[in-house]
């Protein structure tokens, strides 16, 4: 399983697991992530030159990382980056969906849904117990997508409320 056909999508749409050693895939990965980084939902700033130069190689060096790409013909139009983690409660792997990006002119065509279906398949093959992701509250289109494909807010006990996402920069 490396590629899926797109039956209800554009006949030229194909979704595949990225091969970080493939120059076409590596270039697509950087271009799509840079486009996403410049979007308000991605922070509004381009990737650093360091990230652009080293991203594919650094992901390839991490066996817990995998990415999914969407192509419309020869044009790269979508990306999902994933990092495998570990659920201590389930004592099984989990997969965190770290980035989901579709070029603005290609949104609304369920490309992200198709990519997430392949992420689900790869994650199950890895024995993952669940998928996790974080999304900005104001990114309503993404929230609707994630709910449509089965994601929900995370809580252990309703009395304790939903989990919140925090970060702390180390440099």
What annotation goes with each model-predicted range?
Residues 86, 104, 139:
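Feature marks short, surface-exposed loop/turn motifs that line or immediately flank catalytic pockets
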Residues 98, 103, 136:
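Residue-level recognition of the GNAT/N-acetyltransferase active site
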Residues 3, 7-15, 127-171:
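C-terminal "cap" of GNAT-fold acetyltransferases
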Residues 8-92, 98, 116, 122, ...:
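Acetyl-CoA-dependent GNAT
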Residues 102, 108-121, 144-148:
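Conserved acetyl-CoA-binding loop-helix of GNAT-fold acetyltransferases
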Residues 74, 78, 110-112, 150:
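Conserved phosphate-binding and hydrolysis motifs of nucleotide-dependent enzymes
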Residues 93, 109, 125-129:
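Short coil/turn segments at alpha/beta junctions that flank glycine-rich nucleotide-binding fingerprints
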């Amino acid at each position: 399983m490396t590629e899926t056909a797109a039956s209800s999508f554009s006949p030229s749409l194909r979704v595949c697991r990225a091969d970080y050693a493939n120059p076409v895939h590596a270039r697509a990965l950087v271009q799509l992530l840079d486009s996403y980084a410049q979007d308000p939902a991605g922070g509004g700033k381009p990737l650093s030159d360091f990230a652009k130069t080293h991203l594919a190689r650094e992901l390839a060096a991490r066996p817990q990382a995998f990415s999914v790409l969407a192509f419309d013909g020869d044009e790269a139009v979508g990306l999902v980056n994933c990092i495998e983690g570990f659920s201590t409660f389930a004592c099984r792997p989990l997969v965190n969906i770290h980035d989901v990006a579709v070029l603005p002119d290609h949104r609304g065509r369920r490309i992200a849904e198709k990519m997430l279906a392949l992420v689900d398949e790869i994650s199950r093959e890895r024995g993952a117990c669940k998928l996790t992701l974080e999304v900005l509250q104001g990114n309503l289109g993404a929230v609707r997508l994630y709910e449509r494909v089965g994601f929900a807010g995370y809580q252990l006990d309703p009395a304790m409320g939903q989990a919140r996402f925090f970060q702390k920069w180390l440099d």
